[in-house]
Amino acid sequence: MTFSVIKKVIEIKKDIPFSDEVELSWFDMQKPNLTAVTKKGVNLVVKAKFTHLHENDILVCEDGIGIKVKRSEDEIFSLEFSDALTFAKTAYEIGNRHQPLQIEEFKIIVLDDISIADIIKDCYANESIKVEKTKAYFKPNGKAHHSH
């Protein structure tokens, strides 16, 4: 039987030496508690009270090992609109589901999430909305989805 050691993160620092890296999605970086596996296969658990993780944070484990946080690309939908009313209604509906969104001129970018699957389906059916599913770095607007 093989056992793997789970490292507990005890501190989050900046600009210190590190020996491993972990890639996290935007969503995972917002979680106060998470488990992850580093590039070298180390299992770790993070309990980041009163904050969330940022790219280039160094997670300091109980044994002093430093693990650098890197962003992974997210599965996203890009929705491009030809009119202001459809744009506003769609943004309202997504916001009403408490989902973060990235707003640009006549464009909304959202994470692929089951809670808005029906909205995305409706967007595909609407000829005035161009829908594209892709992988990219998600950068939501505002601070509505920060740690409270």
Swiss-Prot record:
Pfam families linked to this entry: UreE_C
GO aspect biological process, one term: protein folding
GO cellular component, one term: cytoplasm
Function: Involved in urease metallocenter assembly. Binds nickel. Probably functions as a nickel donor during metallocenter assembly.
UniProt-recorded name of the protein: Urease accessory protein UreE
UniProt GO MF annotations: nickel cation binding; unfolded protein binding
Species in which this protein is naturally found: Aliarcobacter butzleri (strain RM4018)
Similarity comment text for this entry: Belongs to the UreE family.
Keyword Cytoplasm carried by entry: yes
